[in-house]
């Protein structure tokens, strides 16, 4: 399997997970005792998860799909992961990864231009 095909498959899985997380956020998490801030964090994570799942589809078509794909996927994990984790667990210990993840997302978009 070539890099473009792998990145495209990962994008599909990521998109499916974003839909599942969005459904949980809309139907399960919303009914919990979460604060408005926790709901906002979860919604932000889900929004960026969706956006960057679509970006992965684009990365599969760029000149260096493996490079762009790895950077975007790492950025998604470091940005969306802590934003999903904190409202679900009330544990902010991973929140320091979010700025690193955001920076990687920017670099990932730029990598698609290479």
Swiss-Prot record:
GO terms for cellular component: membrane. It comes from the Eukaryota. Keywords: Membrane, Signal, Transmembrane, Transmembrane helix. Residues 86-93 are cytoplasmic. It is found in: Membrane. Residues 26-64 are extracellular. The keyword Membrane applies. It holds the Pfam family DUF423. It is a multi-pass membrane protein. Residues 1-25 form the signal peptide. The chain crosses the membrane at residues 65-85, 94-114. InterPro entries: DUF423. PANTHER family: TRANSMEMBRANE PROTEIN 256. Belongs to the TMEM256 family. This is Transmembrane protein 256. It comes from Danio rerio.
């Amino acid at each position: 399997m070539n890099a473009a095909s792998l990145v495209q498959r990962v994008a599909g899985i990521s998109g499916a997970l974003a839909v599942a997380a969005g459904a949980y956020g809309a139907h399960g998490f919303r009914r919990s005792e979460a604060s408005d801030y926790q709901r906002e964090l979860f919604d932000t994570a889900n929004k960026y998860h969706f956006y960057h799942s679509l970006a992965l589809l684009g990365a599969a078509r760029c000149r260096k799909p493996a490079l762009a794909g790895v950077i975007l996927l790492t950025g998604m994990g470091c940005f969306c992961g802590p934003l999903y984790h904190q409202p679900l667990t009330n544990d902010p210990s991973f929140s320091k990864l979010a700025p690193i993840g955001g920076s990687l997302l920017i670099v990932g978009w730029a990598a698609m231009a290479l």
